[in-house]
Design a protein with these regions (language model features):
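N-terminal hydrophobic signal-anchor/signal peptide
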Residues: 1-24, 125-267, 437-438, 442-452
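A hydrophobic, helix-centered structural microdomain
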Residues: 247-310, 347, 416, 422-452
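Signature of alpha-helical transmembrane segments in polytopic membrane proteins
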Residues: 1-132, 452
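A short, structured surface patch at a secondary-structure boundary
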Residues: 320-383, 422-430
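Membrane-cytosol interface motif
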Residues: 81-85, 137-152, 283-306
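Short, glycine-rich, amphipathic interfacial segments at transmembrane boundaries or analogous
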Residues: 218-219, 286-326, 386-405
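C-terminal terminal-structure detector
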Residues: 375-452
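Loop-to-transmembrane-helix entry motif
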Residues: 81-85, 89, 253-261, 337
Length: 452
């Protein structure tokens, strides 16, 4: 099957999904909400509302991976579908209330959501099964330099579930006989130095083989290079993170507006959580020194989720998750719902944090990381954030090196659109238990987790 046929088939299946999810909203609008608005809509207006739903669902679906049929778990695909549909329904409910100049009955909307859940489940199960039947895993080779971490890449990270790994080759073995890659549709290159990697890249591109490079830190930094011409030569300019003044101004304005609105809306939750934590014994809030842009220190504010004497021995430790006996009963609940992070909205308002940016580390833990990999300090080029690229696309126990690369990918490409995508995608991970996992029991830092 050609790439063109492959792409056409995928688009058709996605369009079917778009129609299936839109139908419940269309019925809800046509049978009820269209009669509630102040100005009556004609058939063109009705189609405009239905079209608006479809466009918003498509855009949010891209953020929540709602159309990613090759996801390992059907439940994750359904979750993304339902989340995108509910977010779209919520936005259009607000629009309808504004047009009706009053609060409208929620029951028809809830009925539409129920219909969308059924449609999403049906489509996800059929599409997931169809995808792996029509597009079986591609024969794949993995080329590596150091074997450390290779098994994690193939098994834990799910490479073997999406690709048919036929062989794993040491880079020297591969360079001695590049024809070993013949017959492969995909090649993953991990930890290979640029000179050897370029030889393999050229061969694979010439043979029409897809190449996926797992980058090193230097590669991530180079990805943000500015192409230019000097001395009649193509040149790539690489420098320190230097976002434009306009970008920083708009980003700060967004931080202030969003944090203020969130504080007002979530104030009842804020109050209830504070009372619950206080009733557990000890103060409601917990302050801790963290690092932000250029290594500046600030006190991050959280709802206390651990015992007051959690670090009485003076040793800084990362949480080991549900098995951590330092976490209180209330702490388990607020951590699961991410409510312990709510007070950081005050840090954002003050200017210590941004909504999106690399998560701030404790100075002593950051120092341990920097001893092992000095490039870890590069993430201090940008202001720390409440959520970030690594939080959305990694896990709590993703290795420090992988988190660093994710943070540097964000820093290399500053974009307000990317910030908005990360904010929206953060909603998805709030209810995903694997994103709250801690480090292995007995490890004090994630660096130790990597070696366990």
């Amino acid at each position: 099957m050609s790439k063109f046929q492959h792409d056409v088939m995928l688009k058709i299946v996605k369009i079917i999904d778009l129609v299936m999810i839109t139908i419940p909203f269309a019925l809800c609008w046509e049978l009820y909400y269209s009669y509630q608005v102040y100005a009556k809509f004609g058939w063109k207006g009705n189609w405009a509302m239905i079209g608006l739903f479809a466009v918003l669902f498509f855009l949010l679906g891209k953020v929540y991976d709602s159309f990613w049929m090759s996801l390992q778990r059907i439940s994750e695909l359904i979750y993304g579908q339902v989340l995108a549909a509910m977010a779209t329904d919520g936005i259009l409910y607000i629009v309808i209330c504004l047009m009706a100049r009053r609060l409208c009955n929620l029951l028809p909307g809830i009925a539409a959501i129920a219909g969308q859940v059924v449609m999403a489940t049906l489509w996800a199960r059929c599409a997931h099964s169809w995808y792996f039947r029509i597009f079986p895993p591609q024969p794949t080779a993995v080329v590596y330099d150091v074997r450390h971490g290779l098994e994690k890449l193939i098994n834990e990270y799910g490479l073997s579930k999406k690709y048919d790994v036929k062989m794993t080759l040491n880079v020297e073995e591969c360079l001695n006989d590049l024809s070993l890659l013949d017959g492969m549709q995909s090649v993953f290159i991990s930890g290979v130095h640029s000179h050897e990697r370029n030889i393999i890249l050229k061969y694979c591109v010439g043979q029409g083989i897809n190449v996926f490079v797992i980058p090193r830190v230097g590669d991530v930094i180079m990805s943000g290079a500015q192409p230019m011409h000097m001395f009649h030569l193509p040149v790539l300019r690489v420098g320190r993170y230097m976002a434009s003044p306009e970008f920083l101004f708009v980003k700060r304005a967004m931080d202030i507006v969003i944090s203020l609105v969130a504080l007002v809306i979530l104030s009842p939750v804020f109050l209830i959580t504070a009372i619950a934590v206080k009733s557990d014994g000890g103060p409601a809030f917990y302050k801790q020194v963290r690092l932000t842009e250029d290594g500046k220190q600030f006190e991050i504010l959280k709802f206390r989720s651990m015992r007051v004497d959690a670090e009485k021995d003076g040793v800084a430790r990362l949480s080991t998750g549900d098995k951590d006996d330092r976490i209180t009963k209330v702490g388990h609940i607020i951590r699961a719902c991410r409510l312990d992070e709510l007070p950081q909205l005050l840090n954002i308002l003050k200017g210590d944090l941004s909504i999106v940016g690399p998560r701030p580390e404790r100075p002593e833990i950051a120092a341990q990381y920097c001893e092992e990999m000095p490039e870890f300090a590069l993430r201090l080029q940008a202001k720390a954030g409440l959520t970030g690229y690594a939080q959305v696309y990694g896990k709590y126990n993703t290795t420090p090196y992988d988190k660093l690369q994710m943070d540097l990918m964000y820093i290399a490409h500053p974009s307000l659109i990317e910030d908005l995508k990360i904010m929206l995608a953060t909603v998805k991970i709030l209810f995903m238990p694997e994103s709250t996992e801690g480090v292995a029991e007995g490890a004090t830092t994630a660096m130790e987790q990597e070696t366990k």
